Amino acid sequence: MSLGLYLHIPYCFSKCRYCDFYSAPGQRGVPTQYVDALLRELARFAPEAPLHPDTIYLGGGTPSLLSPADAARLIAAAAPAPGAEITLEANPETVTEQTLCGFREAGVNRISFGVQSARDSQLKTLGRPHTARQARAAFAAARRAGFTNISGDIMLALPHYTQAEFDETLELIAEGGATHISAYLLKIEPDSAFGRHPPEGLPSPDEAADFYLYAVEHLEHHGYRQYEISNFAKPGYEGRHNLIYWDCGDYLGLGPAAHSCMGGRRFYYPSDTEAFLNDKAAPVMDGGCGAEDYLILQLRLRKGLDLAAYKARYGKEFSTAQLAFVKNCVKSGYATFDGSTLALTPAGLIVQNSILAELL
C-alpha cells in the first residue's frame, strides 16, 4: 500500500482574494522554528524507522518560501522510497533559477506553479502577486534547473472571463513545458475576500459549465488527458500524490489544518500555527474513511468506480434503484457503464453532486 506524506507550509506574503485555505503571514519566509516543528511531528509518527513515503507533497500556503536547505532537511527526514514523487507548490514571483536548482538538489522532482491566468489585469483582480511575464520566466527557469515534471494551475470562469483568456493561459503553460495542468472553476467561498465582496462580471452557472467543457476539449487537444475532474496530464505524468487521496489510500498530513487518513481513520491538526509551533496542537480524530468516501472520490476520476472493487472493499452493491438511475445517467450522456465500471463523462462531472445525491 502506497503512503503519501503532505507537509503544509502555511506562510504567504499576501492572501489571494478567492482563497479560504488556512494560511499565516509570511513576509520573512518560513521560520526555522516551523521547519523544526514539522521535523518534530515526523519523528513522532515514525519513532523507530523512517516513513519511506511513496509521495511527498509540500503544499500551502506558499511552500516556495522555504529555503532549499530547509526543504532538504524535511525530505531527508522523511526518507522517501526509491522513485518517490516529490512535489513543491510554487508561486512564480518567489522563485529564481538558483532557488529552483536548490530545490532540485534537495530532492524535489516535481514543481507546481500557480499561474491561474495569463492576463495581468485578471491576476490583479484575483490578488495574485505575480505577472504573466514572471510566470513564463518561472517555467523557463524550472526547465533550466532540470525539472521535467512541471504542473501549472489554471482558474476557469473568472470575472469577465472569455474563451480567449483560457486559450492565452493554456498557451503560456503548455509552451512553458508543463506535463500536467490543473484547471479549477472559480468558487466563491464565504470566508474569502470574494465571499465578502463578490467581484463584478462573474459568469452564470451555465456559462461556467460551458467554459469547463471548452477547457476539457482544448486540454485534450493539446495532449493533456483528463484523469480527474480538475486534473489533466501528458501520458505518465498524472499526479501520484493526489491519486492516493482519490483511491482512499493512506496519507499523513503534518502542519496546521493538515488532514490525514491512516489505517482507515481520519484526523487533522487544528488551524493554529502558533499552537503547532509550540507543540500544543494535538491531532483531532475525525471519523473513518468509509464506503461513501470511496464512492465519492472514485467518481471524481475518469476511470470511474469499479463495482467489484467497491464490493470487495466495503461489501457494498448497487441496488436495483441505483442501477436504474445509472442507466438514466448513461442515456443522458452523463456517464458510461459497462456493467462493471461506472464512470462520469465531462458533462456528468459538472453535475457530480446531483448524481452523488441519488447514489448515496
Segments (PLM) and residue ranges:
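Local cysteine-cluster metal-coordination motifs and their immediate loop/turn environment
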Residues: P10-F21
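Immediate flanking context of iron-sulfur cluster ligation sites
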Residues: M1-I9
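Minor-groove-contacting beta-hairpin "wing" of winged helix-turn-helix DNA-binding domains
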Residues: T341-T345
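C-terminal scaffold of the Radical SAM
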Residues: S2, S23-F45, H52-K316
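A short, conserved structural fragment
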Residues: K331-S340
